[in-house]
Amino acid sequence: MQQAKAIARYVRISPRKVRQVVDLIRGKNVSDALAILQFTPKGATEPVTKVLQSAVANAEHNYEMDTDALIVKEIYVDEGPTLKRIKPRAMGRADQIRKRTSHITVVVVEKKEG
């Protein structure tokens, strides 16, 4: 069974926030997944949609799969490097701000007939 894959690396959004969105579309038909993402009011939907569309394009152009029969086999989020910043506080103190990044991976496969 052939599968197409797409990865978005160093996306500047927390992995926890992206996982909330990713959990909604795991195992779904690609067209259903895109519809769910379109109507989900979260900031993470934009990068997830972009990666999913990239995986579909890879399936179509590299493996000549039927885009109507694609399902989201795997979708997961890994933690990328964290950017550390400092926020000045009162009395000469400073707090550390962690700007987290994510790596989003999507694998799509063609659904078998029958």
From Swiss-Prot:
Keywords: Ribonucleoprotein, Ribosomal protein, RNA-binding, rRNA-binding
Pfam families (UniProt xref): Ribosomal_L22 (PF00237)
Ribosomal protein as UniProt keyword: yes
An annotated GO cellular component: cytosolic large ribosomal subunit
UniProt keyword RNA-binding, yes or no: yes
GO biological process: translation
Domain of life: Bacteria
HAMAP family, A to Z: Ribosomal_uL22_B
Complex formation: Part of the 50S ribosomal subunit.
PANTHER family linked: CHLOROPLAST 50S RIBOSOMAL PROTEIN L22-RELATED, LARGE RIBOSOMAL SUBUNIT PROTEIN UL22M
Family, per entry: Belongs to the universal ribosomal protein uL22 family.
Function field: This protein binds specifically to 23S rRNA; its binding is stimulated by other ribosomal proteins, e.g. L4, L17, and L20. It is important during the early stages of 50S assembly. It makes multiple contacts with different domains of the 23S rRNA in the assembled 50S subunit and ribosome.
Protein name: Large ribosomal subunit protein uL22
Organism: Desulfitobacterium hafniense (strain Y51)
Taxonomic lineage: Bacteria, Bacillati, Bacillota, Clostridia, Eubacteriales
Gene that encodes the chain: rplV
